[in-house]
Swiss-Prot record:
Subcellular location, principal: nucleus
Biased composition (Polar residues): 162-176
FF domain mapped to chain residues: 223-288
CC per GO annotation: cytosol; nucleus; perinuclear region of cytoplasm; peroxisome
Name this polypeptide is given: RGG repeats nuclear RNA binding protein B
Phosphoserine, modified sites: S258
InterPro entries linked to this entry: HABP4/SERBP1-like (IPR039764), HABP4_PAIRBP1-bd (IPR006861), STM1-like_N (IPR019084)
Ranges of biased composition (kind: Basic and acidic residues): 99-108, 132-157, 184-216, 258-283, 311-336
Function: Ribosome-binding protein that acts as a regulator of mRNA translation by promoting ribosome inactivation. Binds RNA.
Location relative to the cell: Nucleus; Cytoplasm, Perinuclear region
Gene behind the chain: RGGB
GO molecular function: mRNA binding
Residue ranges with Gly residues bias: 58-77
Keywords, sorted A to Z: Acetylation, Cytoplasm, Nucleus, Phosphoprotein, RNA-binding, Translation regulation
Highest classification ranks of the organism: Eukaryota, Viridiplantae, Streptophyta, Embryophyta, Tracheophyta
Length: 360
């Protein structure tokens, strides 16, 4: 059995693409047809027939725009039938895809036929032993699409432009240099004249220019102060004096008595009465019995002998009695007459035997 060389598919890379194009049969150019005489317009076909013709047209119907000339995934088109999944992997540089054209994309660009190769899973290889999952680099150098570098834009002129670098440097002319030289010579002459004048001045004249110190005696100083005080007193505003002569012609008017004074007097007396009543209430003496009241609201001794039996809690129910504390209540009510004798009398404060004073 003869062995098949698996690397036989790579022989096309060694050939020149121009030779491959020349070896292919040339297309026969169809003769130019002469213009036919005009015919009468025919009746348009029905809509169903027009749809069929559009589908069968070489454009491909719906998929003409998406998959048109290259057929990379269009729904329709001429290249749908040219799919060759079982063909060799180096056809048009795609392992199992669609054909782009008869001559190939590489032939139109002048590049080698073949390019990227990969299996049906989508891996790439550029004729080398790079990894299956690594995409190869492009064969041309990358250039900036904008064609602008990192430098500042200084091109053009006008109001809205930066201008050129030459605009910053003012051109040096002979006239400007001559003007500068003249100014320097004039300044030098002025400086020399001032220096000569300063040398000609004598030290005696310099001493005369110094201000003399003013000296005053004490009497002169006091006179100056008095003059200042007089000037200040003159500036002060004199006090206003009232002339009584202007009021001599005036007459006194009789004032009518009004009832408002009486109303104010009554209101004042009522307030005084309220204050005195409050003071009297506070001064009233309280009876001592109020201080002898037992705490927690318990009953205390009453001279008339009122109700003395206090309520107690319910006792345990015995027999058929609904109210076990009824006997206690009755017993408390019966003690109204003899309650005063049972309790001790209240102490008399005025009795000296009960409250002996110290020192007796």
């Amino acid at each position: 059995m003869a062995s098949v060389n698996p690397f036989d598919l790579l022989d096309d890379d060694a050939e020149d693409p121009s030779q491959i194009v020349a070896s292919k049969p040339l297309k026969v150019v169809a003769p130019v047809q002469t213009a036919k005489s005009g015919k009468m317009p025919t009746k348009p076909p029905p809509p169903s027939q027009a749809v069929r013709e559009a589908r069968n047209a070489p454009g491909g119907g719906r998929g003409a725009g998406r998959g048109g000339s290259y057929g990379r995934g269009g729904r329709g088109g001429n290249n749908r039938d040219s799919r060759n999944n079982d063909g060799p992997a180096n056809e048009n540089g795609y392992g199992g895809g669609y054909r782009r054209s008869e001559e190939g994309d590489g032939a139109r660009r002048g590049g080698p036929v073949g390019g990227y190769r990969g299996d049906r899973r989508g891996s790439y290889s550029n004729g080398g032993d790079s990894g299956d999952s690594e995409r190869p680099r492009k064969n041309y150098d990358r250039h900036s699409r904008t064609a602008y570098g990192n430098e500042d834009k200084r091109d053009g002129a006008g109001r809205a432009n930066w201008g050129t670098t030459q605009d910053d440097i003012t051109p040096v002319t002979e006239e400007s240099t001559a003007v500068v030289d003249k100014n320097l010579t004039v300044e030098k002459q002025d400086g020399e004249g001032e220096a000569t004048d300063a040398k000609n001045e004598t030290p005696a004249e310099k001493a005369e220019e110094k201000p003399e110190d003013k000296e005053m005696t004490l009497e002169e100083y006091e006179k100056v102060l008095e003059e200042k005080k007089k000037a200040l007193q003159a500036t002060k505003v004199e006090e206003r004096k009232v002339d009584t002569k202007a009021f001599e012609a005036m007459q006194q008017l009789s004032s009518k008595k009004s009832n408002n004074d009486e109303v104010f007097i009554k209101l004042g007396t009522e307030k005084d009465k309220r204050i005195t009543e409050r003071e009297e209430k506070t001064r009233k003496s309280l009876s001592i019995n109020e201080f002898l009241k037992p705490a927690d609201g318990k009953s205390y001794y009453r001279p008339r002998g009122g109700y003395q039996g206090g309520r107690e809690g319910r006792g345990p129910r015995e027999g058929n009695q609904r109210d076990g504390g009824r006997n206690l209540r009755e017993g408390g009510r019966n003690q109204r007459d003899g309650g005063a004798a049972a309790q001790a009398p209240t102490p008399a404060i005025g009795d000296s035997a009960q409250f002996p004073t110290l020192g007796k």
